[in-house]
């Protein structure tokens, strides 16, 4: 029996990965409520196995004809599968770094895993949402769980402050996005499916432009694009490090999935307008994120501005609007997951050992912890785009796609800001590898030996090794990964590329077919 076969009119097989995550969430919740202390120690393993199970179902789903569920509200096309995989993989690595972190912080872990799985579920549904209601519910599920995670360490005033700032800015951006969706609902005469709205916007005039602006504002918040980035540095600095790791990749991946589907499906008639707006946002984001990062003295805050700058690079692929542009965007998010989460795993370990994330306190770390120094150095250099690491090939594909699409200004700004980013990444690496004992910081001088057998430490080490290996070998294997991304773009009809129309004949739903007919023009052609 094929477990992915359509179930009734809802085609429930399309959401099997989400079902696995939901069941895991319920099991974790029940064990945390009724289990003893011994049972609660199994919560990280239960969460991790559930997330790995969801990844397996996503791999199996890749081999099946694409389906829609909830009567056309959710699409399980290849692009959706890849983005959902990114969200799940981010959550799995977050679990690995969270166990030891919250044990040492004295915070209960059960509720955190429930919130993390809830946010993961929201991100997964957001990646495949094809209906206004599904988009909003998924966005709120992801957002509310993220606000609660940001303030999870209640005893830390910085965490409470971060949660409040995140809540206020998030609520404002949600209101703006909701107003844009209400305009779309009115302009289309009450349509909620994204593909059904597009034909009504061809002659919408100023109101249509207004709807686009409001929707871009809401999406820009999720991407931490300038000028919607103000929440990012403070939230990243004050929130627990595992939460920051999830927000920097998982939430951002879901945001880019929403951006691609929403803009390509709803606004094909305004392609030039949203590309022009996003071009300006991309330039501002790359410049501000990378320039301001130079002045940072705390590594978490530096990574916050780095995350803003990285979003600007990824926007190049979205602005290009070509097959290569979308494929390079997805590929870069794949490698960004490995190198950025690897950096946060290292920051987590160092803060557990020293209680600080001041960059100066990393001075001389190589002499006390060569493994941590190696992992953090590789991840930072990859974020800077140095060959032959994964980040270099990710930026190479993005810049090449932008150049082919005629986005010369974006590519040149990207190249200049990439050079700037190398400076502040190398500065951290140089601080860690100083050879003179007298230059060793006080925190490193008192650096305790690492007990890898302590509770939560084996998972942390596995996460560091996995991200280190992925960061190194994703560069070597960049061609197969980019081919996978290209295949996903080609086989997702809502993007409207010619090969997508021939994919899985008879399996594409009417709403996807409508979206495919409103194809984006390729600038490179």
From Swiss-Prot:
GO process terms (BP): ATP synthesis coupled electron transport; photosynthesis, light reaction
Entry's Gene Ontology molecular function annotations: NADH dehydrogenase (ubiquinone) activity; quinone binding
Chief location category: membrane
Keyword Transmembrane attributed: yes
Keywords: Membrane, NAD, NADP, Plastoquinone, Quinone, Thylakoid, Translocase, Transmembrane, Transmembrane helix, Transport
Short name of one Pfam family: Proton_antipo_M
Residue intervals passing through the bilayer: 14-34, 42-62, 78-98, 117-137, 167-187, 201-221, 240-260, 276-296, 302-322, 330-350, 374-394, 396-416, 462-482, 494-514
Catalytic activity field: a plastoquinone + NADH + (n+1) H(+)(in) = a plastoquinol + NAD(+) + n H(+)(out); a plastoquinone + NADPH + (n+1) H(+)(in) = a plastoquinol + NADP(+) + n H(+)(out)
EC number: 7.1.1.-
Membrane topology term: Multi-pass membrane protein
InterPro entries in the record: NADH-Q_OxRdtase_suN/2 (IPR010096), ND/Mrp_TM (IPR001750)
Assembly and oligomerization: NDH-1 can be composed of about 15 different subunits; different subcomplexes with different compositions have been identified which probably have different functions.
Family: Belongs to the complex I subunit 2 family.
Biological role stated in the UniProt entry: NDH-1 shuttles electrons from an unknown electron donor, via FMN and iron-sulfur (Fe-S) centers, to quinones in the respiratory and/or the photosynthetic chain. The immediate electron acceptor for the enzyme in this species is believed to be plastoquinone. Couples the redox reaction to proton translocation, and thus conserves the redox energy in a proton gradient. Cyanobacterial NDH-1 also plays a role in inorganic carbon-concentration.
Protein name: NAD(P)H-quinone oxidoreductase subunit 2
Source lineage: Bacteria, Bacillati, Cyanobacteriota, Cyanophyceae, Synechococcales
